[in-house]
Amino acid sequence: MSLRLNISGVRKSYNGKPVLNACSFSFDRNGVYVLTGSNGSGKSTLLRICALIESPDNGEVIYFSGNNIISKDILLRRRITLVLPGIGLFNTTVFNNAAYGLKIRGGKNKETERKVNNALKFVGLIHKKNHNALTLSSGEIQRLGIARAMAIEPEMLFLDEPTASIDNENTEIVENIILNMKKEGRSKTIIATHDMLQAGRLGDCMLLMDEGKIIKV
Ligand SMILES: Nc1ncnc2c1ncn2[C@@H]1O[C@H](COP(=O)(O)OP(=O)(O)OP(=O)(O)O)[C@@H](O)[C@H]1O
Ligand SMILES: [Mg+2]
């Protein structure tokens, strides 16, 4: 049963300043949702709250499978993931970095290897699997972050500024990765981006953060 997310009346303030203000939305359909909005409008905050990294001050963040509410336990957390613009790298191979999410989830070795190799192929980094991750370019690092997330086959994938500070060539590669994931149609991807043209290229559903709320555009 596909995972759905409903947020309602979500409020979040930092140091007394409201960032999310009774923000509500239902992520019901598989595909790509693109969230745009000015700097500081709360996009990253919203992604962290949706990905269960942070809790709202008020309001509800509810995951459903069909019509059943799913408790926010480790099993649910294994089905969702957030990729941040500067992913943390470990001083080891590209393969080990991409395998990290699966290893902490206790994946079996053979299965882990298959999934990680597939994810590295998907993002065009398989030829670098034995290289030290610290030698990658910023575009490749961004792709490695996506591979690490894809290896766990998330049903809900949150990408925060996936092409921030990478060149046109790598932006195109990352966009193609996202479009290819979309073709597979198995997951929901929620992307925060400043780039309106990119939003148009990738999104099935366009969302705008405005005054602490999501507006569908
Ligand atoms: N952990 C935090 N502590 C204090 N203030 C925070 C924290 N996280 C976010 N903020 C503040 O909340 C507001 C919204 O920040 P957020 O990062 O969610 O916006 P954004 O839309 O992602 O911005 P950008 O486009 O620059 O990435 C900003 O004013 C930011 O300074
Ligand atoms: Mg942000």
Language-model features: where?
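Conserved ABC ATPase "signature" region
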Residues: 110-128
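H-loop/switch region of ABC-family ATPase nucleotide-binding domains
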Residues: 193-194
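ABC ATPase NBD coupling module
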Residues: 67-81
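The feature captures the beta-strand-to-loop junction immediately N-terminal to the Walker
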Residues: 36-38
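Helix-to-loop junction immediately C-terminal to a conserved catalytic motif
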Residues: 51
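Conserved ABC ATPase signature
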Residues: 132-136, 140
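Catalytic Walker B motif of ABC-type/P-loop ATPase nucleotide-binding domains
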Residues: 157-160
